[in-house]
Amino acid sequence: MKVMIDTNVIISALLSPHGQAAKAFYKALQPPFEPLVCSYIIDEVQRKFAEKLAAHASKLCRFEDILPLFRLVPMPAETVEGEMFIRDIKDMPILRSALAAGSDYLLTGDKDFLEADIKKPQIVSVAQFLAI
């Protein structure tokens, strides 16, 4: 089962390694799951650490160390079905990548995703993913 892990879950997992987001993050790295990431998410994680979390740079290094465990998926430029349900246009590249990769789940804490009427991939919160 393919899981696209959103930026907010990655950052929460890195900052609180014993928290619920970290548990979901590490669960997604284990079979039967296949963790997915796109260049947009990688760039966003790096940018947020540079802009707001510079004091935690060592935690960013941890992410970069485990990045080879993820499958890097393409980020299509074309509009995809379901985009009209996303309020924040900055989230569209993530949805496009998840759809192009055939992701089963999008693991996120982003309310714009969680409240959107998107059927595929299944949008799940940390708590929902931990219950799978």
PLM region spans:
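Metal-dependent nucleic-acid phosphoesterase active-site entry motif
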Residues: 1-18
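Alpha-helix capping/helix-boundary segments
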Residues: 9-10, 41, 112-113
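Active-site neighborhoods of divalent-metal-dependent phosphate/nucleic-acid chemistry enzymes
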Residues: 71-106, 111
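Domain-scale selection of a single, long terminal region
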Residues: 39, 43-81
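Acidic, PIN/NYN-like endoribonuclease modules and their adjacent C-terminal/linker elements
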Residues: 104-107, 111-132
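A secondary-structure boundary/capping signal
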Residues: 6-7, 37-38, 109-110, 125
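PIN/NYN-family metal-dependent endoribonuclease catalytic core
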Residues: 5, 21-51
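Residues that scaffold the ATP/ADP-binding catalytic core of kinase and kinase-like folds
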Residues: 13-14, 48, 116, 132
